[in-house]
Amino acid sequence: MSRRSTTTSTNFGLSWSLVDVISSSTAVFKVPMNGGCDLWIGCARWLRDMKVLTTDKNGTMLEFASVLRDGILLCRLANTLVPNGIDQKKIMRTNQPSPFLCCNNINYFAMFCKTYFNLEDADLFTAEDLYYMNGFQKVLKTLSFLSHTKESLSRGVDPFPDTDNNQEGTSNGSEFEDDVEIYQSLHDNIENVDPNRTIYGPITSADPEEQQSEQLYDRIVTNRKPSMNENDLQNTPTLKRNRCIRELYDTEKNYVAQALVTIIKTFYEPLKGIIPTSDYNIIFGNIEEINVLHTALLADLEYPVKVALGLSDATPPRPISLNECVPQTIGEVFIKYRDQFLAYGKYCSNLPDSRKLSNELLKTNEFISRNINELTAQGNCKFGMNDLLCVPFQRLTKYPLLLKELQKKTDLASPDRKSLEEAVEVMEDVCNYINEESRDTNAIKVIDEIEQSITDLSMPLNVKLHDYGRVNLDGEVKMAESTLTQAGKPKQRYIFLFDKVIVVCKAANKVMAAKTTGASARTNTFTYKNAYVMSELTIDKNASLDVKSGGTITRRTQYVIIMTRDRNENNEITQLTFYFKNEATRNNWMTALLLSKSNVSPTDYLRDTNHKVAFHSFRVDVKNPATCDVCDKLMKGLQYQGYKCESCNMSMHKECLGLKKCEAVRKSTHETRSSQSFNCNRPRFHIHEGDIVVANSNSTPSDLSYLQFAKGDRIEVIKMQGHNRFTGCLINNRNRTGLVHLDHVSQSRTTSMIGLSPIDSPAGSIAPRVVRNESTVLPNKLLSDGSSRSLSGPHGSRSSRNSSSSTINGSMDSVPRQQDYVNTEISEFLWYMGEMERAKAESTLKGTPNGTFLVRYSKNRKQTAISLSYKNDVKHMIIEQNSDGKVYLDEDYIFNSTVELVQYYRSNNLIEIFAALDTCLKNPYSQCKVFKAVHDYDAPSPNNEGKFLSFKTGDIVVLLDTVGEDRGWWKGQVNNKSGFFPLSYVKPYDPATEGSSSPVTPTSSSS
């Protein structure tokens, strides 16, 4: 899983005009101010007086609205008016804007208003009114009503608007209806504002309880006394360092004696048996374990502190066991106790529940309340039990600061310097570990609530929605789902983007009865529509604009994200398109999608390492914590903390993936060279996409990415994945998909052999770099939109073409080894172009996108070659053949046939064998729609963001999209530039008929 900065602002008077500034530049709305200005400024003033807002300045109305949007300040206001009016545990905080969480908070506030102030729906606003800024005047109306209640007035705070004749409320005030136009700009511009970058930013994190705990820590632990003036003549570097050492040691003594021992002796031990065991364990958590830790740490600190201070009575402690290494420096003490500090993870995660439960017992259980009060008095405690239980969390956060300050004041030549630097890293690592554990604990609760809100989502036994990773973004998106033959219509959907899957829902806000008063409040509920596995999706980073209707391409511009999905059936969804009204929202979603994709498929981090990794959840064990094998730091969080390599078994953080190469690959490569005759990973039979296989055993995998099936089940092969695995689905339940290992299946007698797979080769064990952990539990829904237009290409469906070759590869022995003629087996594939020389291949592939390829037979060399378009150039690779008739591009990767070799490199990066080629064989040239410019076209000026594509007569234009075709426009690419162009300016291009006129660069050799 925040960086905050503030911008300056100005106090505005009542005579100014509203100018909302976005990104410190653009004036987006301007209207003479009247009552509307008075209202929001009055509301901001009232919230400041109520101590909910902590800034003494006004920003713009847009900034003010943005900080109310997540509902946290409203919940804080509710608890200011009525203490504990909203359960603190229910208030949801998030690092990124989440409509689901924000609307939940707003709904809690609405329920509070109905429960405690009997507000009617007419006096309330909905979550949509605030979050989407559809009715900000309603928000001000509700808050104005609350400002006139006795709970507010009793605090001596003036209400708003400040009128002499209305002291009971403003629910019927016309000023809220007269100025609706003032708030209309908020809806269009709210997405462009980051509340953390406004003048109000710091208030969103200023939790009053945290501030109170900080003050309490200072009183109990720090207990600062007046010290010498920093400018004192004797304030030498040594004295400064000694003061740091004393502060560290003295505060540790105070922490143990004044906080931990007091908790244990005054409350923890006496209350055992008085408070029910389950409640007792929640309230105190593992405080005893923390007390043991710090008692030992304090004892170990004594000797290094005395040595550092130069005290004469410093006596080295005796080790209590043969294996114990007694710390000699302050830094070594903290390094020694790193793993024990992880006990704070459980304590800090439990702290909110502890505070809530103890407060409830103090209010509702007279017997327990009386005992706690008596124990407080008997122990002469200046602070309550709840206050003391918050101190450990505050103490933990101080260690990195104290050690870092001591490090700064320690000379570089000091023998203590190195251990201090390491101690700072260790304690920062520990604090990050605790933060991630607390964050994941909260995130899992949120995801469980999301799962409950999707009313018709049916999950398999022992599988939860949070098993698919963290939620990286959620919100309403207009989305189209298209198949090979149907272009889907854009529909409003609610998307939950997890690390591993995209869950598609439809918002269905229902009215739920309140348990206490019979009132009703809107809650977030959804109906399940579909789900998509991130590892199966390819995100188009270039497509960004879509243009709809009107007489010109510049009208109704929408921002889009396009994702494609490998599927062969006509009724299976192959493309997802997200539509957005503005670029900022699109960029947010693109960033989140790329994050999810990168998490499950971190290919950019794996370059040249040969690791084969899977996104992995490491077992959380504070006694023996998982650490990264590269940096030796902790694997943080409760799930999917990092990656594990299947070859060398290394555990790694994401950022450490590229720092160390896989040693297992070197070993296996050597073994392959020395013994090509045997490969334990080679399957006993050949299967291909579209085949039907039969399960030869039951499989109930613990890994959610694998398919669950019973012996005898028939399974269809959807996609070969390498490493003797494929993605398959049950014939009797095609909604269930997942990985299947070849050891668990056998060939069906009715299997159709339609082509070879890379899994069949001796190199089959060299799997893709990222192990694809597909989903097995989320059902898919087929698209059935009869009104959609066809998307099929000129070649039609691949399945019909492949079916004709069903018996070609029945036996590997029948494949001729001789390669001095065109192999009829190869001719069945779209990528094979027959006889073609190097120059012709270059002119054919000129200008095509990266990864476009063809396979050709060179009559001159009597060899088969692959020609590939890459970075505005055409690369050629000769397919070599050994004495056994096997083929290869590199001798470490041997294949039985050319078909097998090509299929392998369609899903595996060529960088494995060619350092200069960072691509796979993506698209056969025959499937690439290529046109030739018949007129010059110059993009209009200004050509903002390269929306239009310029070209010259004779240029080769690759068609990317037919969007805008009904208005005479296509989207295409020339070299590495893309954009819209008039479709009448090009004609179909066929190298076969235009070969003589195509520009050809002579070469010295032909292949």
Curated annotation (Swiss-Prot):
Residues 163-174 have a biased composition (Polar residues). Residues 151-239 are annotated as: AC. SUPFAM superfamilies: Calponin-homology domain, CH-domain, Cysteine-rich domain, DBL homology domain (DH-domain), PH domain-like, SH2 domain, SH3-domain. InterPro entries: C1-like_sf, CH_dom, CH_dom_sf, DBL_dom_sf, DH_dom, GDS_CDC24_CS, PE/DAG-bd, PH-like_dom_sf. Keywords: Guanine-nucleotide releasing factor, Metal-binding, Phosphoprotein, Repeat, SH2 domain, SH3 domain, Zinc, Zinc-finger. Residues 470-598 form the PH domain. Residues 37-151 form the Calponin-homology (CH) domain. Disruption phenotype: RNAi-mediated knockdown results in male tail tip defects. GEF activity is regulated by phosphorylation on tyrosine residues. Residues 831-925 form the SH2 domain. Residues 153-176, 778-817 are annotated as: Disordered. One of its GO terms (cellular component) is cytoplasm. The modification Phosphotyrosine is found at Y183, Y200, Y217. Pfam families: C1_1, CH, RhoGEF, SH2, SH3_2, SOS1_NGEF_PH. Residues 688-750, 926-991 form the SH3 domain. GO terms for biological process: cell migration; negative regulation of Notch signaling pathway; positive regulation of locomotion; positive regulation of nematode male tail tip morphogenesis; regulation of vulval development; small GTPase-mediated signal transduction. Residues 782-814 have a biased composition (Low complexity). A zinc finger (Phorbol-ester/DAG-type) spans 610-664. An acidic domain (AC) contains three highly conserved tyrosines that are involved in the autoinhibition of GEF activity. Acts as a guanine nucleotide exchange factor (GEF) for Rho GTPase. Has a critical roles in the generation of rhythmic behaviors: feeding, defecation and ovulation by dynamically regulating the concentration of intracellular calcium. Plays a role in male tail tip morphogenesis. This is Protein vav-1.
